[in-house]
Amino acid sequence: MTAVDAPDLLDYDDVLAKYEPVLGMEVHVELGTETKMFCPCPTEFGAEPNTQVCPVCLGLPGSLPVVNEAAVESAIRIGLALNCSITPWGRFARKNYFYPDQPKNYQISQYDEPIATDGHLDVVLDDGTTWRVEIERAHMEEDTGKSLHVGGATGRIHGASHSLLDYNRAGVPLVEIVTKTISGAGARAPEVARAYVTALRDLLKSLNVSDVRMDQGSMRCDANVSLMPIGATELGTRTETKNVNSLKSVEVAVRYEMRRQAAVLEAGGEVIQETRHFQEADGTTSPGRRKETAEDYRYFPEPDLEPVAPSAEWIEELRGTLPELPWVRRARIQADWGVSDEVMRDLVNAGALDLVIATVEAGASPEAARSWWVSYLAQQANTRGVELAELPITPAQVAQVVALIDSGKLNNKVARQVVDHVLEGEGDPEQVVANHPELVVERDDTKLKAAVEEALAANPDIAEKIRGGKVAAAGKIVGDVMKATRGQADPARVKELVIEACG
C-alpha cells in the first residue's frame, strides 16, 4: 500500500498515541523591491502577462545577471531580525531542473553558502506559552514564472487541455526561510506551525520587506510533515505540502497529513516522499510529484555572479535600521493600555491588533477600538467570509464612528447602521450621517419627554414601581422610547427623563 492508497483517516488521538509528529517549515517571501533580483524589470503585481520580462529573466543567450542590492539588504535585515548569523561570504548557486515556468532550466538560488544561518523565532501559542522555533537558514533566490492550466476541473495540469505561461514573476527576488526540525510539540504541532507562520508574517510586515499577502502568493508556505513512532530515534518519511495560502490552512494541512500518514502506516503501507497539494475546499491534500533530493538538482556555483560579501560595518548599519519588533511593540502597547495577557492574545489571534492600534492612533480610545474590531466588525467579517483586515472599512473610519458616539450624534445601536452603510461603500461615517439625518440621535428633550410620558401612560404599573424607588424597572420604559424613536435617542438621557418624570 502506498500513500495514495490511504484508507480512512486515523482519529487524531489515535495518531498521538502511537506517533510523534515532526515538522519542518519552508516559507518563501517575495521581497517588495521595485525591480527583479538580477535584472531591471519591474515587479508590479497584476500586470498583463509577459509584459515585465527581458532577456535576463527569460534566460536568453548572452544575457548576464546583476545582483539587486536592495534585495540583499532586505535579506540581511530578515536574517538579523530572526537572530541569525550573517555570512561574510555568501555564494549564489544554480539549481538545475526542467519545468516550463523556469525559462533558464535552472534557478539562481543559494545552496551551501546562504546569506543567513542559525537563528530562532519565539512564537506565542494560543494559551500564552512560548515555543522557540529554530531557524536553519534564510537564503536568496529568484522566483519562477507562473503556469495557468486551462480546461481541467482542478486548475492543475492533470486533465487540462492546454497550459499558458506568464513570466512576469520569473526573477522576482525571494528569501526562503527554512526551519530546523520541529519536534516535541505532540498534539500542538499543527498549532505551532500556524503560530510560527503567523509570527513570521508579522515580523516581515514590521520590517517592510514584503506585503506578505498569502492570497497573492507573496508569502508561500510549504509544510514538511513526518511521523516517528513513539520511542523511535529514526525520523519517518516526510511529505511536503506546497503553497498553503492562509494561516488557518497551515494548521489544517498539518493536522490532515498527520492523520493521513498514520492511516497509511497503520494499514501496513509506506509513506512516499513526495510533494502534495493542499485542497482549500475540503481541507485535504492530494499527491503531486515524487520529492527530489539535493543531489537531483546538481547544484554548482553560479559562474556569472560574484559572491555576496557584506562587510561587518554594513551589517551593523542595517541592524540599526530594524524597527521595533512585533513582540517588543506588543509588550509596550499592553503596558500603555493596561490590558491583560488574555486580552492581547485574543487581539492577536483575531488578527485585530494592528487594526486596533491604528484606530487608537486615529483618535479612538483603546477600549472602544477593541470593542468594535473584536465584536461587530468581526461578525461582519465572518458573515462575508473574509479576513478582518479585508473589510471595506479603515481604522480611521472606525475612529470617526467612535468620535460620533462620543459627541452624542450617534448611539451604539445606530452606529452599527452607520458602519453598515460604510461597508456598503457609501463613504466615510460623517458623510453617511449627512446623507441619512434620520440616523442622528434625537437631542430635542421636548420630543423625548413626550415619548417618555406616552410610554409611562401605557405602563402604569411600571411607572408606579419607578415612583416607589425601583429604578431598574425604568429599563422597560427606556426600551419602549428607543423603539418609538427608531433607536435615535440616547438611552442614558432617556433614563434620566424617565426618573425625572416619576420623581
From Swiss-Prot:
<dbReference type="InterPro" id="IPR006075">
    <property type="entry name" value="Asn/Gln-tRNA_Trfase_suB/E_cat"/>
</dbReference>
<dbReference type="GO" id="GO:0050567">
    <property type="term" value="F:glutaminyl-tRNA synthase (glutamine-hydrolyzing) activity"/>
</dbReference>
<comment type="function">
    <text>Allows the formation of correctly charged Asn-tRNA(Asn) or Gln-tRNA(Gln) through the transamidation of misacylated Asp-tRNA(Asn) or Glu-tRNA(Gln) in organisms which lack either or both of asparaginyl-tRNA or glutaminyl-tRNA synthetases. The reaction takes place in the presence of glutamine and ATP through an activated phospho-Asp-tRNA(Asn) or phospho-Glu-tRNA(Gln).</text>
</comment>
<keyword id="KW-0067">ATP-binding</keyword>
<dbReference type="GO" id="GO:0006412">
    <property type="term" value="P:translation"/>
</dbReference>
<dbReference type="GO" id="GO:0070681">
    <property type="term" value="P:glutaminyl-tRNAGln biosynthesis via transamidation"/>
</dbReference>
<dbReference type="InterPro" id="IPR023168">
    <property type="entry name" value="GatB_Yqey_C_2"/>
</dbReference>
<dbReference type="Pfam" id="PF02637">
    <property type="entry name" value="GatB_Yqey"/>
</dbReference>
<keyword id="KW-0547">Nucleotide-binding</keyword>
<dbReference type="InterPro" id="IPR017959">
    <property type="entry name" value="Asn/Gln-tRNA_amidoTrfase_suB/E"/>
</dbReference>
<protein>
    <recommendedName>
        <fullName>Aspartyl/glutamyl-tRNA(Asn/Gln) amidotransferase subunit B</fullName>
        <ecNumber>6.3.5.-</ecNumber>
    </recommendedName>
</protein>
<dbReference type="InterPro" id="IPR004413">
    <property type="entry name" value="GatB"/>
</dbReference>
<keyword id="KW-0436">Ligase</keyword>
<dbReference type="InterPro" id="IPR018027">
    <property type="entry name" value="Asn/Gln_amidotransferase"/>
</dbReference>
<comment type="subunit">
    <text>Heterotrimer of A, B and C subunits.</text>
</comment>
<dbReference type="InterPro" id="IPR014746">
    <property type="entry name" value="Gln_synth/guanido_kin_cat_dom"/>
</dbReference>
<keyword id="KW-0648">Protein biosynthesis</keyword>
<dbReference type="GO" id="GO:0050566">
    <property type="term" value="F:asparaginyl-tRNA synthase (glutamine-hydrolyzing) activity"/>
</dbReference>
<dbReference type="GO" id="GO:0005524">
    <property type="term" value="F:ATP binding"/>
</dbReference>
<comment type="similarity">
    <text>Belongs to the GatB/GatE family. GatB subfamily.</text>
</comment>
<dbReference type="InterPro" id="IPR003789">
    <property type="entry name" value="Asn/Gln_tRNA_amidoTrase-B-like"/>
</dbReference>
<dbReference type="Pfam" id="PF02934">
    <property type="entry name" value="GatB_N"/>
</dbReference>
